C-alpha cells in the first residue's frame, strides 16, 4: 500500500475512533434514561418478530411512518448489547457507532467530491463537535438515528454511487427513506437526496437514467411503506401516522390558518445558531450561512446534484415547516439538515478564485473548528446527562449479586419523572415480587439498604 492510499484509509478510521470516544466517554455513568429510551430499549430486547410495524410515537401525536428505527435498534441490541449486559447504555454506544461511521463516510465523501482534505476535515469537525449534537448522539433516540442515516445517504450522493449504478440508487434511496422512518423531520434531507440523484443524471444528459432512477426511488419508498400499510389495515382504530402534520396542512389549505414563514425562518435560524454556535450562539452566524448559500448557488449553479444536498434541504425545511400550525419546533428537528448546512457554510467561505487561497481559507476554518472544540465539548457535558444512571447501575448490580427478590426499588436521590429505578435491575436478571418482604433502597454511593 502506497503512502497516499494509507493516508486515505487512516484518516477515516481515526475519525471513527475519535468521534466514537468523544461520544461515549462516561456513558455508563450518565446515560440519559427517560421514558423514550426505556420504551424503545424494551422493544429492542424482544424478538424481531415482535417489533412494531411503525416507528416511535411522536410528541404531537401519531407515530413515525415506518419501523426502520426499531430494526436498527434491534440489530444494535443483538450485536452490541451482549458486550454491555444488554443494558440501555449499550444501545447508546451502538447508536454512537452508527453516528461515527456516518461521520467517517461523510468525511471521505466530501474529500472525494471537493478534492480538498481541508474542506472535508473542517466540515467534519464542525458537524461532529457541535455541542447539542454531541450531547444527544449517544442516546437511544430516533431523531439522532434519522440524522445519522440522512448523513450516510448524503455521503453516498457525494461520492456519486447513485450515478454509477441502479444498486447505488436503490441503496441510497433506502438509506434516505429509512431516515424518514426514524424521524419525520429528515424528510427534507431525503427529498434533497432524491432530487440530487435525478437532477445529477439530467445535468449529464442522461434523461433515461434520470427517469429510471426516479422509478427506482419511488419503488424503494413504496416497499418501505408496506409495513405502515399493513399496520393500518390490521389496526382499524389506529390513529393516522402524522395527524398533526396533515391536520396543520389541512387548516392552511382550507383558509383557517396561514403559513408561518417568518416563524419558520426564525425556528431554522435559532436552531442553526444553537446547534452550530453553542456555547456562544452569535446572532451573525445565520447571516454567514445565508451569505455562503448565495455564494454556493452562484458558484455551483451548474451542479444541481450538489445544490440539492446542500442548499435545497434548508429551503425545503423553511418552506415546509411554515405549514406546521402550533407551538414552534424544537431545535432537534433540524439535526438532519446540519451536514448540508455546514457544507454550505464551508464551501461558501472557501469559494476563492485561486485554489491556493481556497485551500488556505479551508485550513484556517479547520484551525478555528479545532480551537473551539474544547469549549463545545465542555458545554455538551452540561446537557442531557443523568448522573443518577451510574448510581442506579451500581446499586442494581449489587442487588442482583445478593440473589433475592425485592418488592420494589426506591432511591435515596431524586430521579427525573419518567425514569424507572427498576429497569436496570430487571435487565440484569433481578426479580420484582410484590409478595417479597423488603423494598430495596439505592444510595448515591451504590449501596443497598432494605425497608419493610
Describe each PLM feature range.
Residues 43-46, 190-292:
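Transmembrane-lumen/periplasm boundary regions of multi-pass, lipid-linked membrane glycan transferases
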Residues 132-145:
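Short acidic/glycine- and proline-prone juxtamembrane loop motifs at membrane-interface regions
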Residues 13-16, 218, 349-378, 388:
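Signature aromatic-anchored transmembrane alpha helix within multi-pass, membrane-resident enzymes
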Residues 136-137, 284, 305-357:
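Hydrophobic/aromatic-rich transmembrane helices and adjacent perimembrane loops
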Residues 123-124, 168-184, 195, 318:
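Membrane-interface alpha helices of multi-pass inner-membrane proteins
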Residues 22-26, 37-64, 68-71, 75-80, ...:
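Extracytosolic helix-loop segments that constitute the early lumenal/periplasmic catalytic or substrate-binding loops
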Residues 93-114, 149-152, 292-299:
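Transmembrane-helix motifs of polytopic, lipid-linked glycan transferases
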Residues 112-114, 153-171, 179, 349:
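Membrane-interface transmembrane helices that cradle and orient dolichyl/undecaprenyl
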